[in-house]
């Protein structure tokens, strides 16, 4: 039965672990040089996805990941996956108080259940439907997983993607009119059309809730740059009343998560990616410190600060620690910005008395430094 398949897949992978029995170089060569391969899908999941065995009821795939971070999602299939190469941060969630707005749009409360570090040889069951909501943040390049999965499990769709803390959407719904409208709005953004904001406002006034949300989600970044976001949100909120209330926290969380995921593509060091994964997926300072302590020896805060030093970037445009920018209102030569910014970060991470290096800094400038860090990915870790 379908209910038994995840356990069957786990036992098969654990009985003959891919990490010990699959030669990745040979698999790559054979796939490139021999045409006698199973039928390949058009799926965009994986970078790439290789189907290495196909059966009418199930198939086996090798998923490569270069800079991929999966959305929080559920599955319309069941089975299991095993880490062949690399490691990942794996997070599980539950979606409580769920309410269907349409067949493709749900509201509720997404709660983090568990976060674990998956390493080579670790195996995880996949249960179709809403009882298995998860995400993966891959640390090494490449990371490779072997998946044994059914073709599709009837009655377990749609395969929702979750937008914390409150929304679930069907990413493959066939609303092609909304798709084309979003693409056309992208053209107007690219060409700096002066009508962009006014057209969005008119659309928000006429579109239903679901289409209005997707339009806002697509336009949010440009509307903020134009200074028109507050007006657009007010129009959406006025039109939809209490139904709109859970939307804003999810839209703001999209901005935070997208910023962290975007940094992942330019960061290859596994330790730095590990920090990004924790900042993206965990919800408290204590949880981050516990996960760092689990993987690395030494003081977790010292490890985090060491990574912060390595992640500091100075250029003509400014000084950055991850996505925290040195404040414009502090007048300081460029070569002195990074030492001050890092000293402030170290102080706000550890708490306690002000260190000697910061005693000469004015309260106003110290507040600006803290505000810059609080508006970035570092916020969760500050004391």
Predicted features and spans:
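A short hydrophobic beta-strand segment most commonly corresponding to one strand
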Residues: 80, 140-156
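Conserved short histidine dyad/triad with adjacent acidic residue
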Residues: 60-74, 127-129
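Short beta-strand His + acidic residue motifs that chelate non-heme Fe in jelly-roll/DSBH
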Residues: 71-72, 90-91, 114-117, 126, ...
């Amino acid at each position: 039965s379908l209910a038994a398949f995840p356990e069957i897949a786990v036992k098969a992978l654990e009985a003959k672990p891919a990490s010990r029995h699959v030669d990745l170089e040979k698999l790559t060569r054979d796939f490139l040089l021999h045409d006698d391969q199973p039928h390949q899908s058009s799926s965009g999941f994986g970078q790439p996805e290789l189907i290495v065995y196909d059966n009418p009821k199930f198939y086996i795939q090798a998923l490569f990941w270069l800079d991929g971070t999966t959305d929080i999602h559920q599955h319309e299939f069941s089975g299991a996956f095993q880490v062949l190469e690399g490691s990942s941060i794996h997070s599980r969630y539950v979606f409580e108080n769920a309410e269907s707005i349409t067949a493709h749009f749900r509201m509720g409360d997404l709660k983090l259940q568990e976060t674990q570090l998956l390493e080579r040889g670790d195996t995880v069951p996949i249960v179709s439907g809403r009882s298995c909501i998860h995400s993966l943040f891959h640390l090494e390049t490449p990371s490779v997983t072997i998946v044994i999965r059914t073709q599709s499990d009837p009655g377990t769709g749609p395969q929702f993607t979750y937008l914390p803390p409150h929304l679930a959407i069907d990413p493959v719904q066939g609303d092609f009119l909304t798709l084309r409208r979003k693409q056309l709005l992208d053209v107007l953004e690219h060409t700096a059309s002066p009508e962009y904001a006014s057209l969005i406002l008119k659309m928000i006034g006429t579109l239903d809730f679901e289409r209005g949300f997707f339009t806002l989600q697509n336009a949010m970044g440009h509307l903020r740059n134009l200074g028109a976001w507050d007006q657009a949100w007010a129009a959406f909120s006025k039109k939809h009343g209490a139904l709109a209330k859970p939307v804003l926290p999810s839209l703001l969380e999209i901005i935070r998560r997208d910023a962290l995921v975007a940094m992942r593509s330019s960061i290859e060091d596994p330790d730095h990616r590990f920090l990004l994964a924790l900042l993206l997926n965990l919800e408290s300072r204590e949880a981050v410190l516990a996960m760092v302590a689990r993987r690395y020896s030494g003081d977790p805060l010292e490890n985090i600060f060491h990574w912060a030093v390595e992640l500091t970037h100075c250029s003509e445009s400014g000084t950055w620690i991850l996505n925290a920018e040195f404040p414009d209102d502090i007048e300081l030569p460029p070569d002195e910005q990074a030492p001050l910014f890092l000293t402030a970060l170290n102080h706000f991470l550890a708490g306690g008395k002000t260190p000697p290096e910061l005693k000469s800094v004015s309260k106003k400038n110290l507040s600006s430094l803290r505000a810059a860090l609080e508006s970035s990915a570092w916020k969760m870790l500050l004391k």
